[in-house]
Amino acid sequence: RLNETVLPTVIATPDNYDPTHEYGMVVLMHGFGSHMGDLAGLAPLINETDFIYVCPNAPIEMTIGFGQQGYAWFPAGGQTEPDDIDKAVSQLQTSVDFAIDKYRPNQSNIYIGGFSQGGMMTMHAGLTRPDIYKGAIILSSRLTQVDLFTDKIVHLDKIPIFMSHGTNDLVISIKDGRDTKELLDEYGYQIEYQEYPMAHEIREETISDLKDWLSKN
């Protein structure tokens, strides 16, 4: 834990980490029912030399069966209220601010991304803060609380987005992914959008395309 006021967080640094060097930073948020360690393993696959990865734990504890603990950013489905999202966004931002202060990344090279519910958070916490983030990564996700989101971003600068989805996704349908992409298109976002013949998951092809996108954006 970075300190008591922020979310528990896994920090992944390059192997030969030099605290005097100004690295980029990537904030990665896990999905509903998962935990902060879930996406940390992607760090060396995405780029193992140029970035510090910040993987916060979602704030809401939940039981996911077999005695296992999981975590959520906000209540799922129809139970989600705008206040739930605003609270999660605030908690996330406190944690990101702390990590930025501690690791001193290149302020013009900070990205935010997430998988599933973490992708929803990316839209609400990342696309609303073009003053902080250079680009956004939305993996197998969809937009929730559309009005809350569009009210905030309508007059903001639009950061580039990498977005991917599996055509066989049974958790968040490919239609929901495509509808979200279309809405973001309408608001002027530049999106690299990829579909893969996969379920609700992240595959090597996703990482390969994401690496290419990061190198160009």
Annotated model-derived regions:
Residues 162-165, 169:
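Short beta-strand/loop motif that positions the catalytic acidic residue
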Residues 108-156:
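Primarily recognizes the serine-hydrolase "nucleophile elbow" in alpha/beta-hydrolase
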Residues 3-105:
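Serine-hydrolase catalytic machinery in alpha/beta-hydrolase-like enzymes
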Residues 34-35, 61, 144, 170, ...:
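Active-site loop signature of alpha/beta-hydrolase-fold enzymes
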Residues 57, 113, 137-140, 164, ...:
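Alpha/beta-hydrolase-fold catalytic nucleophile elbow
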Residues 30-32, 113-115, 166:
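Conserved alpha/beta-hydrolase "nucleophile elbow" surrounding the catalytic nucleophile
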Residues 162, 175-217:
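C-terminal catalytic histidine-bearing segment of alpha/beta-hydrolase fold enzymes
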Residues 45-48, 152-158:
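Short, conserved loop/helix-junction motifs that constitute active-site signature segments
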